[in-house]
From Swiss-Prot:
Function of the protein: Produces ATP from ADP in the presence of a proton gradient across the membrane. The alpha chain is a regulatory subunit.
InterPro entries in the record: ATP_synth_asu-like_sf, ATP_synth_asu_C, ATP_synth_asu_C_sf, ATP_synth_F1_a_nt-bd_dom, ATP_synth_F1_asu, ATPase_a/bsu_AS, ATPase_F1/V1/A1_a/bsu_N, ATPase_F1/V1/A1_a/bsu_N_sf
Keywords: ATP synthesis, ATP-binding, CF(1), Hydrogen ion transport, Ion transport, Membrane, Nucleotide-binding, Thylakoid, Translocase, Transport
Classification via PANTHER family: ATP SYNTHASE SUBUNIT ALPHA, MITOCHONDRIAL
Matching NCBIfam families: atpA, PRK13343.1
Record field: catalytic activity: ATP + H2O + 4 H(+)(in) = ADP + phosphate + 5 H(+)(out)
Site annotation Required for activity: residues: 363
Enzyme Commission number(s) of this protein: 7.1.2.2
Organism: Synechococcus sp. (strain JA-2-3B'a(2-13))
Residues the entry annotates as binding ATP: 170-177
Complex and partners: F-type ATPases have 2 components, CF(1) - the catalytic core - and CF(0) - the membrane proton channel. CF(1) has five subunits: alpha(3), beta(3), gamma(1), delta(1), epsilon(1). CF(0) has four main subunits: a(1), b(1), b'(1) and c(9-12).
Any GO molecular function: proton-transporting ATP synthase activity, rotational mechanism
Protein name, entry field: ATP synthase subunit alpha
Family: Belongs to the ATPase alpha/beta chains family.
Length: 506
């Protein structure tokens, strides 16, 4: 056994005294009173903030939502299966934030930006708060640039501008997600970063969307935030805010972003579940009193920034699902009142083969017309009126047997315009193609073409224009206008193609 000399003992004691750290670590600790259904009631944690992150003994994270007199109601982000009554909880002193950066492009992540695509960790240097204040009045400017969706019916009749919030609303299986995905596909080469937020969707549906985006090369400029149907309610509630936070990072760098929230009905249901479990008083349709604020604070973050802030933009396309075309339910009316217009999709039109199934009569864009390109404005000015008149006459014509010639002409024109606006999914059209087909329809070139041949005429005309008259496309795409020269080329092309088309049909 080694012996220690007395002088060594004094040296050891001196070293121990020198190494002694007087700093005290103060942590705010509480105790779990009750846990279950993704909710925990905690005693203690006197100095906790609203929406502060909490750390449970088993490593689960929670968010403090209810700060009551004698306890705290927290929601669990995770299963929380190992949390027991009496477990300790620490407050972290942090509000929920996520890592953001260019590294997210092309990735599929959960609402906390953890990768779900098996492509390894995401290296981000910056982080942003999930709940950020929306830009103020001085920080914004009015919407003036178009966001081309590639869907002729929308770009001609319900145009969307960069920085706008346009609601896509309709029953299940009416093509809401298809409209949003088509819009993302059409942003290729437009320098727009797209974020698709899937809330409460089936995993197979999310995989299908990711598959289409990957196949078409759209994942190069897209990010998918997924909180599937099997995700805990708090993650489904946070997912849209996470998508907005990622978009804000790019927006404040002067870039243009597009965010699709698919869909906000499921986010409201997740929030209702959490609120009822936290014993918050229920209101209409059992939703809590602040469900309007839930969506307004999210959608107000979409903006077109002023020139001082770099002129970036965030365009929001929220999706809301209705039951039996009831637009007057609680969540649909809330979101309609917050957004700058809505695209209403109808199951009757969808089943009748009119796809995209847009009801032109009640769909509206409140600010998009200011952003519509001059070329589109020139050719599409009369199409909305003509379609609306056609719908009225169509209902009338079912009961009247003998119609005057003018009415018959109007009905024939309306049928052809309706046929012209049909478009298969995942095949967006460029601006010059849209202008060409609408010009052909509104200027009467299709009036003597049989309705069933309008679709093949449209396809043939676009192919003919691209091969024999490429200058037309160059002029329209570079100037965004239908100049006199472009119009002459277009007239010549339509006349030439129509002659050959009619000759072949005969």
């Amino acid at each position: 056994m080694p012996t220690i000399r007395p002088d060594e003992i004094s040296t050891i004691i001196k070293q121990q005294i020198e190494q002694y750290n007087q700093e005290m670590q103060v942590s705010n600790v509480g105790t779990v009173l009750q846990v279950g259904d993704g909710i925990a009631r905690i005693y203690g944690l006197d100095k906790v903030m609203a929406s502060e992150l909490l750390e449970f003994e088993d490593g689960t994270t929670g968010i403090a939502l209810n700060l009551e007199e004698d306890n705290i109601g927290a929601v669990l982000i995770g299963s929380g299966r190992n949390i027991q009554e009496g477990s300790t909880v620490k407050s972290t002193g942090k509000i929920a934030s996520i890592p953001v950066g260019e590294a997210l492009l092309g990735r599929v992540v959960d609402p906390l930006c953890n990768p779900l695509d098996g492509k390894g960790p995401i290296q981000c240097t910056e982080s942003r708060l999930i709940e950020s204040p929306a830009p103020g009045i001085v920080d914004r400017r009015s919407v003036y640039e178009p966001l081309q969706t590639g869907i002729t019916a929308i770009d001609a009749l319900i145009p969307i501008g960069r920085g706008q919030r346009e609601l896509i609303i309709g029953d299940r299986q009416t093509g809401k997600t298809t409209v949003a995905v088509d819009t993302i596909l059409n942003q290729k080469g437009q320098d727009v970063i797209c974020i698709y937020v899937a809330i409460g969707q089936k995993q197979s549906t999310i995989a299908q969307v990711v598959g289409i985006l990957t196949e078409r090369g759209a994942m190069d400029y897209s990010i998918v935030v997924a909180a599937g149907a099997d995700s805990p309610a708090p993650l489904q509630w946070l997912a849209p805010y996470c998508g907005a936070t990622i978009a804000e990072y790019f927006m404040y760098q002067g870039k243009h972003t597009l965010v699709v929230y698919d869909d906000l009905s499921k986010q409201a249901v997740a929030y209702r579940q959490m609120s009822l479990l936290l014993r918050r008083p229920p209101g209409r349709e059992a939703y809590p009193g602040d469900v309007f604020y839930l969506h307004s604070r999210l959608l107000e973050r979409a903006a077109k920034l002023s020139s001082q802030l770099g002129e970036g933009s965030m365009t929001a396309l929220p999706i809301v699902e209705t039951q039996a075309n009831d637009v007057s339910a609680y969540i649909p009316t809330n979101v309609i009142s917050i957004t700058d217009g809505q695209i209403f999709l109808e199951s009757d039109l969808f089943n009748a083969g009119i796809r995209p199934a847009i009801n032109v009569g009640i769909s509206v864009s409140r600010v998009g017309s200011a952003a519509q390109t001059k070329a589109m404005k020139k050719v599409a000015g009369s199409i909305k009126v003509e379609l609306a008149q056609y719908r009225d006459l169509e209902a009338f014509a079912q009961f009247a047997s003998d119609l005057d010639e003018a009415t018959q002409k109007q009905l024939a024109r309306g049928q052809r315009l309706q046929e012209l606006l049909k478009q298969p999914q995942y095949s967006p059209l460029s601006l010059d193609q849209q202008v060409a087909i609408i010009y052909a329809g509104t200027r009467g070139y299709l009036d003597d073409i049989p309705v069933e041949k309008v679709s093949s005429f449209k396809q043939g005309l676009l192919a003919y224009l691209g091969t024999t008259h490429p200058k037309y496309g160059e002029i329209v795409l570079s100037t965004k206008q239908l100049t006199d020269e472009a119009e002459e080329i277009l007239k010549t092309a339509i006349t030439e193609f129509k002659q050959s088309f009619v000759a072949k049909a005969a």
